[in-house]
Regions:
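Ligand-binding loop in jelly-roll beta-barrel domains
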Residues: 19-23, 180-181, 186-216, 334, ...
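Glycine- and acidic-residue-biased ligand/ion/polar-headgroup-sensing regions
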Residues: 141-144, 149-171, 321-324, 329-352, ...
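Active-site-adjacent segment of 2-oxoglutarate/Fe(II) JmjC oxygenases
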Residues: 202-261, 384-441
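A short, N-terminal "cap"/entry segment at the start of jelly-roll beta-barrel domains
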Residues: 18-133, 233-316, 320, 326, ...
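Intrinsically disordered, low-complexity regions enriched in proline, serine, glycine
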Residues: 147-149, 166-168, 175-176, 207, ...
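Fungal secretory targeting signals
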Residues: 1-21
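Short acidic-glycine-tyrosine-enriched beta hairpin
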Residues: 129, 139, 155, 169-190, ...
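Structural signal for hydrophobic/aromatic residues that build the beta-strand cores
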Residues: 139, 158-165, 182-187, 195, ...
Length: 453
């Protein structure tokens, strides 16, 4: 292996390792210290495919890479190009074919209703979204998402504001709770429930359903059912004269302005048959004690700490500026990511030499099929990335590349990666000798203490 090629491999692996305090980063010769020239120009050279924040640095991507490429002469969408710099100028390591793994809610159709709206990302918008579907919903103060149920289970994360949820369990137990930003709810398939915005600006949340074919327009609605049931039957069911039901809606209400709710205690039905549910349908995700990493924080919610959530597991990540969610993969489910804040790039390795890099920003959805290796790198040196990793699974599972190599016999690792350079192999194995998992790795400064291999 030639020295420049060896150094590309060596320094690339080191950048992804982002060592703990006691570890020393791998170093390389100063002549390969970093990229040369202005990004996206014919003279730009970067043998290591470093990140470029086109949006933050106000750069216009062009398909130039290490002496290859040419300018663009035809029609262009410059805003989209800035949002997707790694599609315009892919890293040299990208190769082969891969279906699209990115969708923006900004491209989804919005259904506008009285005091609210909804939009969705399903397998119809993003064909790789096979296991999960997402719905972004907004309810103003007092606005109700009417009483309904689904074929699928519903998991939700509150993005802003406060919301009141109601639900009924299979034992006839009632659940009512007021939730706020950073909290979750989960309704098992078929369980009836409702939602209502509470705070002055209402609420906005992300809904997740455990089937990529889900459609928000195909839910079972109270008003829709009664509008399509003979009033004589309704009267018999509720033991009330048919005339009482002449005032009910003739079609579904779906999202509508409701009356102002009182306190939960004031709203509890007073009938003798009322009982509280023994199930906990809500969870305070952001109140969890975080997993602290060198480059951020992680909170994991699954059936181990939110028992009712049998089909959806999730991780909330805060990735600090310049930091990276380490190279890893998930063995039990596809990853469905929702980016809440910041800008990031993700390279997905699909085996057989196939890899592709996608860029994400707030409001984007990303898919990584199960077992495909990937990372999430914060493109910005100033702004954190906040992202949800969501899975159709009862438990969150992942494998860390760093931990795997750190706990594999050193001889085996060196035989795989550094057979032609024992010195490089020694440096690498020293860097991974503490195999403790570091889920989000802080940015490493490779400009210090340069050494020749």
């Amino acid at each position: 292996m030639h020295l420049p090629t060896l150094l590309v491999v060596l320094l690339g692996c080191s950048a992804l390792a982002a060592p703990f305090v006691q570890q020393q980063p791998l170093t390389g010769p100063s002549r390969h210290a970093g990229p040369r020239g202005k990004p996206f120009t014919p003279g730009h050279r970067d043998p290591y495919d470093g990140k470029i924040d086109a949006v933050g640095e106000k750069l216009q991507p062009l398909p130039y890479r290490n002496g290859d490429g040419a300018s663009m002469l035809g029609p262009r969408n410059r805003a989209r190009e800035r949002q997707n710099p790694d599609l315009v100028r892919p890293p040299s390591t990208d190769h082969g074919n891969m279906p699209n793994m990115r969708w923006s809610f900004a491209d989804s159709h919005i259904r506008i209703e009285e005091g609210g709206w909804t939009r969705q990302t399903t397998i119809r918008e993003l064909p790789t979204s096979k296991e999960l579907a997402g719905v972004n919903m907004r309810l103003d103060e007092g606005v109700i998402r009417e009483l309904h149920w689904h074929i699928q289970a519903e998991w939700a994360y509150i993005l802003e504001g406060r919301v009141r949820i109601t639900a009924l369990d299979l034992e006839g137990g009632s659940f009512v709770d007021d939730l706020e930003k950073g909290e979750l709810w989960y309704f098992p398939a078929g369980h009836p429930h409702s939602l209502q915005g509470l705070s002055p600006n209402g609420t906005e949340f992300l809904l997740i359903f455990d089937d990529g074919n889900f459609s928000e327009d195909s839910t079972f609605l109270l008003t829709d059912w009664l509008a399509h049931t003979p009033k004589d039957v309704i009267a018999e069911n509720f033991r009330v004269a048919p005339e009482v039901f002449e005032a009910i809606p003739e079609s579904e209400k779906y999202i509508f302005q409701g009356s102002s709710p009182g306190s939960i205690d004031e709203e509890i039905p007073k009938g003798k048959g009322y009982k509280r549910s023994n199930l906990q349908f809500a969870h305070k995700m952001l109140a969890q004690e975080p997993i602290n990493a060198t480059g951020g924080q992680v909170r994991i919610t699954d059936s181990t700490n939110f028992p009712i959530s049998k089909t959806v597991a999730a991780a909330h990540l805060d990735i600090q500026p310049g930091a990276m969610r380490e190279m890893h993969w998930h063995p039990n489910a596809d990853e469905w990511s929702f980016f809440i804040r910041g800008r990031a790039r993700v390279t997905i390795f699909a085996a057989e030499g196939n890899a592709r890099t996608f860029d994400y920003m707030a409001g984007d959805v990303g898919i990584v099929p199960r077992n495909m290796g990937h990372f999430i790198e914060n493109l910005s040196d100033d702004e954190p990335v906040e992202v949800l990793e969501i899975f159709r699974a009862g438990q969150f599972q992942d494998f860390s590349l760093f931990q795997w190599l750190g706990e594999t016999p050193r001889r085996m690792v060196k035989d795989h990666l550094f057979a032609t350079s024992p010195k490089a192999g020694e440096k690498f194995t020293k860097a991974i000798e503490d195999a403790e998992k570091d889920v989000i790795k802080s940015q490493t400064d490779f400009d210090e203490d340069k050494q020749e291999l």
